[in-house]
Regions:
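Conserved helix/coil segment N-terminal to the catalytic DExD/H
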Residues: 23-31
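Acidic, Mg2+-coordinating active-site environments of NTP-dependent enzymes
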Residues: 11, 35-190, 265-267
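Inter-motif core of Ras-like GTPase G domains
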Residues: 31-43, 213-218
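Conserved nucleotide-sensing/catalytic segment adjacent to the nucleotide-binding pocket
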Residues: 1-21
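Local beta-strand N-terminus motif with an aromatic residue
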Residues: 13, 35-36, 72, 216, ...
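Short beta-strand segments
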Residues: 19, 42, 78, 219-221, ...
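ATP-dependent carboxylate-amine ligase
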Residues: 92, 151-176, 180-325
Length: 325
C-alpha cells in the first residue's frame, strides 16, 4: 500500500480516499500513512473467521481513530448504523473534529427521505440551514454512505459542506451496490448487490421491499473458508424478507459447495437449491412477472468465481444481461 501511494504521489496525485480494512488495521498495514480524515460507516458482523469476536473486530477498526488519525483530524460518524457503545469508544477522550450524520439529532441531520423510482429525495439540516437534494441512488444505506463521503471531503477547507452535498446530485453509483441491471419483458427489475453478511442482506432486502409491488426474488449463497456462523443467519434473513429464495454457490473456495448451501438451507423452509450460479439466476429471471423484483446477492462487482481452488471468469452482470436480453 505504501509503495502504491508513493507511486501516486510521484504521478502528481495530492489526495487519495482508501478503505482501511480491519485486516489491514490489525496487521499495521495502514500505519505511517498521513491521514487527515477518517469515516466510520457501520459496525456489523463480518470477518469473524479472522477476528473471532465482535470485540476484536471493533478493536481493529478503532485503531484507525485511536492510534493512526492525528488528534486534529476529522472524524465522520454514521450514528444510525453504529451501536452507541462503539460510538462512545470512538468519541470519548479525543480531540478530533467530529461530524455526526443520521436521522436523529446530528451535525448533518436527515429530516426527510423519500424513495423515488431509482432516486432518493432528501431534506437535510446542516449549519442551521435546510436544503433539498435528489441523489440518483436507492437504498438508505447507500444514501448514508454518500452523505458520509460528502462530509469527509470537507477536511479540505476549500470545500464547503453545502457545495459538497450538492455534488451528490450528479453521483454515479458504485458497481454492484444495489445496482439496477435492467428489467425483463414484464418490467420486473433485476438488481445486483454485494451483500454477504446477515446485516447487509437484511438492509438491502428491506430497501428492495419498498420498490416491490408483488414478489421479491433472492438469489444468494455464502463464501467458503469464511465465517460459518453467518450462513444460518443469512438464511433466516432471506426467509424473513424475501418471497422466493434460490440458494446457490458464491465463492466456495476450498470448501464443499453442497455443505455451504446446506448450512444456509437449515434456516429456510421453502428455498430452492441450485448450485450452478448461472442456472440459479436464469431460473429466477424466467419466473419474474409484472410487479416482481429480483435481487442477486453476494458477488456484486466481482468478475470471478472460485470453486475447489480454481478461479474462473464469472460476472453476475454479464449473466443477467445475457439471459434477459
Amino acid at each position: 500500500l505504501h509503495a502504491q501511494l508513493n507511486l501516486l504521489k510521484d504521478a502528481g496525485v495530492d489526495n487519495v480516499a482508501i478503505e482501511a480494512s480491519s485486516h489491514g488495521l490489525d496487521q499495521y498495514r495502514i500505519d505511517n500513512i498521513n491521514i487527515s480524515a477518517a469515516a466510520f460507516t457501520n459496525m456489523s458482523r463480518d470477518h469473524l473467521d479472522y477476528h473471532k469476536t465482535m470485540e476484536e473486530y471493533f478493536k481493529a477498526k478503532a485503531r484507525l481513530f485511536k492510534e493512526i488519525l492525528p488528534k486534529d483530524g476529522l472524524v465522520v460518524l454514521g450514528i444510525d448504523t453504529i451501536e452507541k457503545k462503539y460510538l462512545k469508544q470512538i468519541t470519548d477522550n479525543n480531540k478530533h473534529n467530529i461530524i455526526t450524520i443520521g436521522r436523529s439529532e446530528s451535525d448533518l441531520q436527515i429530516l426527510q427521505l423519500d424513495n423515488l423510482w431509482r432516486h432518493t429525495a432528501l431534506r437535510l439540516r446542516v449549519n442551521n440551514q435546510e436544503i433539498d437534494i435528489k441523489i440518483p441512488l436507492i437504498g438508505e444505506f447507500q444514501i448514508h454512505n454518500a452523505l458520509i463521503a460528502a462530509a469527509t471531503v470537507t477536511v479540505d477547507k476549500h470545500i464547503g459542506i453545502i457545495e459538497s452535498l450538492k455534488t451528490l446530485e450528479t453521483l454515479k453509483g458504485v458497481k454492484g451496490r444495489l445496482e439496477f441491471i435492467g428489467s425483463n419483458k414484464y418490467d420486473a427489475g433485476i438488481y445486483v448487490d454485494y451483500a454477504h453478511t446477515p446485516d447487509a442482506l437484511e438492509f438491502v432486502l428491506r430497501e428492495m421491499r419498498k420498490y416491490t409491488a408483488k414478489k421479491l426474488y433472492l438469489v444468494f449463497g455464502a463464501g467458503g473458508n469464511r465465517d460459518i456462523g453467518k450462513r444460518y443467519l443469512m438464511g433466516q434473513v432471506a426467509e424473513n424478507f424475501s418471497d422466493v429464495i434460490i440458494v446457490t454457490d458464491d465463492n466456495p473456495r476450498n470448501e464443499d459447495p453442497l455443505k455451504i448451501r446446506l448450512d444456509i438451507l437449515m434456516s429456510t423452509k421453502n428455498a430452492i437449491e441450485i448450485g450452478n450460479r448461472y442456472a440459479a439466476i436464469k431460473t429466477a429471471i424466467d419466473q419474474l412477472e409484472e410487479g416482481d423484483n429480483l435481487l442477486v446477492c453476494g458477488k456484486g462487482h466481482e468478475e470471478t468465481q472460485e470453486i475447489n481452488g480454481k478461479i474462473s471468469h464469472f460476472s453476475d452482470h454479464e449473466v443477467i444481461n445475457e439471459i434477459y436480453k
